[in-house]
Amino acid sequence: MRRAICPGSFDPLHLGHCAVIRRATLLFDEVVVAVSTNPNKTHRFSEAQRIELVREVFADDPAVVVEPLESGLIADYAERRGAVALVKGLRNGADYDYELPMATMNRSLTGVETVFLPGEPSLLHVSSSLVMEVAALGGDVTSFVPPEVLRALEDE
């Protein structure tokens, strides 16, 4: 089985994330969506809430497994999970410049490859932080997040 890890905080999960995850399932037998918690960030949703939301959105796809990202190096986590690759979505050159050194380091540590998937053109402007900002200011984020996430945002 060819397994890939798609790591991220997914706070909140948006349609750009969903597109990358769905496309990754076309390349790999299993995609582990590893939900991380950054201690240096304030998260809108708890780790448990984010995991549940991702599970709800991908409930119809048996190739998607959702779990918390263990602390430590992502390269070590990928090795423990038997993953052949990490999958990262890229919206622009700045994302590439940010991700490339990490991809190179991960490969040098354990040999895990990183597969970069370009973002969907219609979603290149979407980020979790922008979704949160627009939602906090009362804007309509319907076209940026899955219905499950929209409901969770409205319930907050």
UniProtKB/Swiss-Prot annotation:
The keyword Nuclease does not apply. CDD domains: PPAT. It catalyses: (R)-4'-phosphopantetheine + ATP + H(+) = 3'-dephospho-CoA + diphosphate. InterPro entries: Cyt_trans-like, PPAT, Rossmann-like_a/b/a_fold. GO terms for molecular function: ATP binding; pantetheine-phosphate adenylyltransferase activity. GO terms for biological process: coenzyme A biosynthetic process. Its cofactor is Mg(2+). It is an enzyme of class 2 (transferase). GO terms for cellular component: cytoplasm. Its EC number is 2.7.7.3. The record marks H17 as: Transition state stabilizer. NCBIfam families: coaD_prev_kdtB (TIGR01510), cyt_tran_rel (TIGR00125). Homohexamer. Belongs to the bacterial CoaD family. Reversibly transfers an adenylyl group from ATP to 4'-phosphopantetheine, yielding dephospho-CoA (dPCoA) and pyrophosphate. This is Phosphopantetheine adenylyltransferase.
